[in-house]
Amino acid sequence: AVHQFMDRLKDVRFYGLHTGTLGFYSDYQDHEVDEFLDVLIHHEGKEEILSVLRGEVNGNCYYALNEIRVENAARTQVMDVYVNDIQLETFRGTGMCVCTQLGSTAYNRSLGGAVLQEGLDLIEMVEIAGIHHSKYRSLDAPLVLKSDSVIQFESESFEGALLGVDSDVYSLEDCKKIEIKICGARHIRVLRGKKVSYFDRLKTLY
């Protein structure tokens, strides 16, 4: 639903009603629909601002709430990784995942990334199946960065690679460089109707 309104985020607020277990976007489950509607009608609750990731490839911009990924299942992806214009490493493997605080509990977590507590305006980068032996080494650990950090991936060839933007994917065939950062001009506004502990939400993941 969020991606349908990416160009209108200044005019939209999101109200979450969860039909499964309690999620990170919503405070109400389907059996609490009456309470949910009462908050909605009376404009009660507290507004929370969520960061949006911005990825730029060949002049095209892509926006994600959870994560932006570079993945190559066809062959080993070799790329130079830069943080704030400083080369961190040359990575070899399947790819890299960059996530927001909210996205840290999603694909990032399954990759062994750290879960970031709510309220922390940070981004995180983690490897996807990196190759590590005596000849090739990289950080091989989650890297948590300040929200104003800029991450760049550069390669002579992204043949076979895909750019994952939350649940959407795009080809990187003609790409040489990918830039990822927090988008200062776009935020997602979510209405919180009742106080639910972050750790109670976290426990629904396991």
Predicted segments with their positions:
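Catalytic core of DAGKc-family lipid kinases
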Residues: 20-94
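N-terminal glycine-/serine-/threonine-rich phosphate-binding loop
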Residues: 1-10, 43-45
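Gly/Ser-rich helix-loop-strand patches that form or flank binding pockets
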Residues: 7-19
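Short, conserved loop/helix-junction motifs that constitute active-site signature segments
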Residues: 8-10, 116-117, 143-145
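Gly/Ser/Thr-rich active-site loops/lids in small-molecule metabolic enzymes
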Residues: 89-135
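ATP/nucleoside-binding phosphotransfer catalytic cores, i.e., glycine-rich phosphate-binding loops
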Residues: 62, 70-73, 78, 83-88, ...
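A generic structural signal for short beta-strands and their flanking turns/coil linkers
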Residues: 49-53, 64-66, 75-79, 94-96, ...
